[in-house]
Amino acid sequence: MPNHVKFFSIMVDDTARAIAFYEAVFGWTFEDWGPPGFYLIRGAGLEGSLHKRQEPLTGTGFRAFEITVGVDDVDAIAARVVKAGGVVTMPKMRIETVGSLIYFNDTEANRVGAMTYDAAYEAART
């Protein structure tokens, strides 16, 4: 498929802390790869990386890109986020005919969305 997202990167201050967070929240695994502090993200057909931020993060809120992860149970993810040290920044919001969405900050102050899509919405997209 042309023009689709093929690879993404999560920039972090503390790689060990961030890896522990994403393992706990989404069950992703990480493979040490390439330069020091650079990890490939594995899980559910993902192609991504997690690595040390090259410069300090400034500001708050959305910083350019937003990634939303499709999940089976957005309430369970919200609980895992808090347990793993993240902060839910927008509680569950229902988007009619689409699904339920939360936003959270990970342990590295990155803003992430998690959404449980309605079955009818998913079926219409396939």
Describe the residue ranges of each PLM region.
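N-terminal first-folded block
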Residues: F7-G43
